[in-house]
Regions:
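Glycine-rich phosphate/nucleotide-binding loop
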Residues: 257-356, 363-367
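Glycine-rich phosphate/pyrophosphate-binding loop and the adjoining helix
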Residues: 134-135, 140-192, 199, 347, ...
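A structured beta-alpha segment of the ubiquitous adenosine-cofactor-binding alpha/beta core
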Residues: 49-62, 230, 234-263
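Glycine-rich phosphate/diphosphate-binding loop of Rossmann-like nucleotide-binding domains
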Residues: 6-25, 154-247
Length: 403
């Protein structure tokens, strides 16, 4: 069988630990035998990020702007332990945070639903899509440890050199910590429009939540920008589509989500979206069963898995022990990127291949063949647990039957 040809490369961002192992397996077993894969490759593994002073991360984001579609493997965000383990020059920022800051846009995450895996919340009947703002807040912060006796202030210098000062805290009797966050109105507006457009495209209600009662400037600005854009640009379109936009406080939103049946988009600020997408994914089944795509205002797409690097399994793998690691989210990152590349290039064969690969993956699980995390969740009678590689080989058997 002739391989499917590509005209434009996908930006490929390799990653760390067990997901890096899975990344290569997916390409070797499920993609390269069928597709003449063209990628612009960047190694975002922590070792190489350290060697390049994180320049490789910036380069990969700029390449994504150039080509329009990227696929990213999970990467390590270093902490103090990783500083020692990898002998890092400095504690590099989150690769995702850097890429999202350059591309702007919104991260949309939705569960991959399969028969046999019932949500932990039995009332959830339909997918809940998390729309996560991809710029700023704690992911682009500045923070310091502060010595006892210090005074911390916010200082803003305008373009004419005039300073505005606001006291944060006078530290008396104890050392402490401070953190500076920021966001920009243009990015918040892009986030709002992306959410409203996605709601119209998918004909789903849109919820948005912050803590504006406490954060009367920061969070309230998010609320105000959303409301202004909705009233001026989207209200009539939403009415015509029969869908609604709904704002509430973040704690009320969590309570409503738990009681709901799903079937809507939940727009969240950056940190809220990070946390809540994990909660939604786990409650629907597994973090390994979640799609994630960053959509920029200029129509650039970056697909990734919504989970981490699966460190515990990686250490088992290094010892030569067998692992049963769920590769579905990483696989769906690849299929998402291949499908979008096909759509943009008018390459129906490539898009169709991505569809068939996803269907083969779902059929494998619904046939009872799955990794350990899904095995404990599945209520199928004929289920069996397989190892990391065998799961991909089982998918390949079903894929071949459709090609």
């Amino acid at each position: 069988m002739a391989k499917i040809q590509m005209t434009t490369p996908i930006v490929e961002m390799d990653g760390d630990e067990m997901t890096r192992i899975i990344w290569k397996m997916i390409k070797d077993i499920l993609i390269c035998p069928y597709v003449d894969l063209k990628t612009d490759y960047y190694d975002l593994g922590l070792v190489h990020r350290n060697e390049t002073n994180d320049q490789v991360t910036i380069d990969s984001a700029n390449a994504t702007k150039k080509y329009g579609v990227a696929v990213k493997c999970a990467t390590i965000t270093p902490n103090a332990q990783r500083m020692t383990e990898y002998n890092l020059k400095e504690m590099w920022k989150s690769a995702n945070g850097t890429i999202r800051a350059i591309l702007d846009g919104t991260v949309f995450r939705a569960p991959i639903i399969v028969k046999g895996i019932t949500p932990l919340l039995p009332g959830w009947k339909k997918p809940i899509t998390i729309a996560r703002h991809a710029y700023g807040d704690v992911y682009k912060n500045s923070e310091m440890k502060v010595a006892d006796g210090s005074t911390a202030e916010l200082v803003v210098t305008d373009k004419d050199g005039n300073e505005t000062r606001q006291l944060i805290h006078k530290f008396s009797g104890s050392d402490g910590i401070i953190q500076g966050l920021h966001n920009i109105n243009a990015s918040i507006a892009s986030f709002a429009r992306a959410c409203f457009n996605f709601a119209l495209d998918t004909k789903q209600d849109l919820w948005f939540a912050t803590k504006d009662t406490i954060s009367k400037k920061y969070d309230h600005t998010f609320k105000d920008i959303f409301q202004e854009i909705f009233d001026n640009e989207y209200k009539e379109k939403f009415d015509a589509a029969g869908i609604t936009y709904f704002y509430t406080l973040i704690d009320d939103a969590v309570a409503r989500v738990v009681r709901s049946e799903g079937g809507y988009i939940w727009a969240c600020k950056n940190y809220d979206g990070d946390v809540m997408s994990d909660m939604v994914a786990t409650a629907f089944g597994s973090l390994g069963m979640m799609t994630s795509v960053l959509v920029s205002p200029t129509g650039v797409y970056e697909y990734e898995a919504a989970h981490g690097t699966v460190t515990r399994h990686y250490y088992k793998h290094l010892k030569g022990e067998e692992t049963s690691t769920n590769s579905v989210a990483t696989l769906f990152a690849w299929t998402g990127a291949l499908r979008k590349r096909g759509e943009l290039d008018g390459n129906k064969e490539l898009s169709d291949f991505a569809d068939k690969l996803e269907k083969a993956t779902i059929k494998t699980i619904e046939d009872g063949v799955m990794t350990g995390d899904l095995y404990v969740l599945s209520n199928l009678d004929n289920k069996r647990k397989v190892n990391t590689e065998d799961f991909l080989l089982e998918i390949n058997n079903r894929l071949k039957a459709t090609l």
